[in-house]
C-alpha cells in the first residue's frame, strides 16, 4: 500500500552462529543435528543463547510467524524464522510512473553493541536471498534482492549491527500512463485551442471572447476533476515534487495564460487601442505560436524517461 507507506511480505530469515557450550563430546562425524520446529523450536530457544535480532521496520504484530532450529553436534546453530507481516517503506514518486522502489526488511540487533554481536553475510547468504519464484506484485516488475550492512547509532557513542535486505521493484507504467498521463497531456490542448480557434480579419477577432472563455472555464473544471480523481487514488502523489504535480501546475498555468490572452486581446483589445490593430494582430500571431511551443517543451521536460528492467524469471 504505497499510500500508507507499507507493504506486506513473507520473509525467511536465516541466522547462523557458533556456541561452544552446545558442542557434544565424543565423535561427531555423521551425527545428525538436533532439529526443532514451531513450538519445540521456541521452547529450545528459551534454553540457549539466541541473538536478539528483530525486524526493526515491521509494523504491528506479524500475521504469521514460524521457527525452525537446528543445533549441530559441533556447536553450530542455525535458526530459520518465517514471518508474514507489514513493513514500513519510504515511497519515492519523483519519477512516477517510471519509478523504482526498494522494499526492504531491516534485520537489527537490539540492546547489544556491535562489539559483542555483529551481523555478517557471505556468498551463501547472498545466494539464499532472492525473491520467491511464486512472488507476484500486481502492477510491478520484481527485481533482485540486495544485502547491505548499515549499523545504527545507539547509546553512549556505540553502534548496533543492522543488515538491510532490499527487493527492487519497478512500476509497470502502462495503465498509469493511460489513466493519468494521457488525460493530463490532452487537457493541455484546451487552453491552446482557446487561443488557436480565434483569428483576426480586418483588425477584428472572428470569435467572441465569451465563447472562448467558456471553453477555458470548462477546461478548468475538467482539470480540477482529474486532480481530485488522481489524488484520491494515489494519495502519495499529493506531497512533494513529482511529474504529476508538475503537469497539473502546467495545466493551471496554461489555462490562466489562455484566459489572460482572450480577455486582454479579444475582450478589451488593449494593443489595438494603445497602438493599432496591426500591432495587435502581429502580437497575437506570435502568442499563437509561442504558447504551444513553450507548453510542449515544458511538458516534455517534466515527463521522465522509462528505465524498466526485465522481471526475474
Name every feature range the model reports, one short phrase each.
Residues 299-313:
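Juxtamembrane boundary at the C-terminal end of a transmembrane helix
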Residues 17, 47-49, 90, 140, ...:
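Generic detector of bulky aromatic hydrophobic side chains
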Residues 163-291:
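Channel- or pocket-lining gating/hinge segments that regulate access to a cavity or pore
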Residues 286-302:
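Hydrophobic core of alpha-helical transmembrane segments in multi-pass integral membrane proteins
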Residues 28, 48, 114, 126, ...:
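Weak global preference for isoleucine
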Residues 118, 156-157, 228, 299-303:
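C-terminal ends of transmembrane alpha-helices
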Residues 1-166:
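Soluble non-transmembrane domains of integral membrane proteins
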Amino acid at each position: 500500500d504505497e499510500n500508507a507507506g507499507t507493504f506486506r511480505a513473507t520473509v525467511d530469515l536465516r541466522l547462523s552462529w557458533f556456541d561452544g557450550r552446545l558442542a557434544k563430546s565424543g565423535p561427531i562425524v555423521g551425527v545428525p543435528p538436533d532439529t526443532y520446529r514451531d513450538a519445540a523450536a521456541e521452547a529450545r530457544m528459551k534454553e540457549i543463547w539466541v541473538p536478539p535480532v528483530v525486524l526493526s521496520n515491521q509494523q504491528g504484530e506479524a500475521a504469521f510467524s514460524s521457527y525452525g532450529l537446528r543445533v549441530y553436534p559441533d556447536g553450530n546453530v542455525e535458526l530459520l524464522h518465517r514471518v508474514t507481516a507489514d513493513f514500513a517503506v519510504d515511497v519515492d514518486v519523483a519519477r512516477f510512473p517510471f519509478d523504482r522502489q526498494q522494499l526492504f526488511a531491516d534485520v537489527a540487533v537490539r540492546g547489544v553493541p556491535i562489539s559483542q554481536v555483529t551481523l555478517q553475510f557471505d556468498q551463501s547468504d547472498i545466494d539464499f536471498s532472492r525473491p520467491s519464484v511464486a512472488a507476484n506484485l500486481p502492477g510491478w516488475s520484481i527485481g533482485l534482492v540486495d544485502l547491505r550492512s548499515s549499523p545504527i547509532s545507539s547509546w553512549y557513542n556505540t553502534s548496533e549491527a543492522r543488515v538491510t535486505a532490499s527487493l527492487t521493484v519497478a512500476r509497470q507504467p502502462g495503465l498509469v500512463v493511460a489513466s493519468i498521463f494521457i488525460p493530463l497531456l490532452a487537457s493541455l490542448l484546451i487552453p491552446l485551442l482557446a487561443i488557436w480557434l480565434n483569428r483576426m480579419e480586418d483588425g477584428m477577432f472572428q470569435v467572441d471572447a465569451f465563447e472562448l472563455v467558456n471553453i477555458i472555464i470548462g477546461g478548468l473544471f475538467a482539470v480540477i476533476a482529474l486532480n481530485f480523481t488522481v489524488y484520491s487514488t494515489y494519495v502519495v502523489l499529493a506531497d512533494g515534487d513529482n511529474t504529476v504535480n508538475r503537469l497539473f501546475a502546467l495545466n493551471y498555468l496554461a489555462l490562466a495564460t489562455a484566459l489572460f490572452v482572450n480577455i486582454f486581446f479579444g475582450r478589451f483589445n488593449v494593443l489595438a487601442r494603445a497602438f493599432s490593430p496591426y500591432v495587435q494582430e502581429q502580437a497575437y500571431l506570435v502568442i499563437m505560436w509561442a504558447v504551444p511551443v513553450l507548453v510542449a517543451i515544458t511538458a516534455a521536460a517534466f515527463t521522465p524517461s522509462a528505465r524498466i528492467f526485465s522481471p526475474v524469471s
